[in-house]
Amino acid sequence: MEQLDVFLLGERVGVLESDRGKLTFHYLPEYLRRADAAAISYSLPLQSEPFDPVVTSVFFDNLLPPDVVRKRLGKILHLSRRNIFGFLEAIGGDCAGAIALYPPGCTKTADASAPTFRELSDEEASQILMDLPKRPLNIGKEEGFRISGAGAQDKLIACVKEERIVLPLYGAPSTHIIKPPVAAYRDSVFNEFFCMRLAQKMGLPVPECGILTLKDVPYYCVTRFDRQNKDGRISRLHQEDFCQLLSVDPEKKYESEGGPAIPQCFQLIKKMRLGAAGQIDFLRRIIFNVLIGNGDAHAKNFSVLYRGKTIRLAPVYDLLCTEIYDSLAHETAMSIGGETSFAGITRGRLSKMAQECKVRPELILSLLDEMLEKITVASNNLADELNRQHPSTVYAEICRIIERQAAWLAVE
């Protein structure tokens, strides 16, 4: 029997056990007795009994990179891609939210009062970023660097201080996600930056993001919303994506593969009591993704953020206009009133989606019209602004997609 201690917000709360690959999780009795005890997941509520292997595996699997990345990581770490326990043992020191995993008795964890960091030279940072395709997440190269992150795109999860990249070591919390250009998708860095900035202009909650340039190569850099900085001291905030909340296998994140649909996500928001503001926020995100042509808004790209007993939708992330790339499917990740083709999404489809969510169609249409009034002008103004700072033809392409979608959705 192998074991890993599970930490939440720096506190040891439970144990993950592997019996020949079969995973179970249980909370510590002394933790359950605490008045302030909190569950590590909506899908793993506080209880004394161990959780069965299925629900345990799904939650912890969702903390790891997808299979396509794990195949490359496995060659470095000598692990098979389905060895969830092995990967968590190797890279689970800093996960999404406030979860961290360590071998029992491990003493090389971050001292919260004096975490360990190593600043990189521009040359080192540039080399690490260029090497990400063959060394995902920079794993296996730096002692004490145990960081996990979901998502298929190559990324470095680290810290950025005064435009210098810093590696957090031995469990110190990371604060930024840095993404290099994706060769297959032209100007992907500027695409994501534009979509995130546009979301902000449309009133959606957006973490601080920007372009970091190293050796004349632009990188998309975003501040982690599950971290907070108080007087220079970094601490973790807990978060869960909708696959974790609904106990859905991460490889089934798309609705077409059996993953969550919009009505299912909406009902979850109701059950978690995020209130009318949370429901409207979610619907506005759905509309925005349709208008920018984002076909990758699947369940793992929506999360909730915990602050004490307060739960709200996490800021938006991983926004990209996929419609400008001919090699990608021209479909939404979650159907809109039964329609997945961007060309087939109409006001009627949005009304049907509202009915499926048990919401008045008038509400979704009013939210749509509110966004239609602003988004075309806002996107063109943003394109002009960004072209002065980071020139790219991709802005005009995204604006054309937005104009097309807006024209289709303005018609009754």
Locate each region found by the language model.
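Phosphate/dinucleotide-binding and metal-coordinating scaffold of catalytic cores
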Residues: 1-299, 303-412
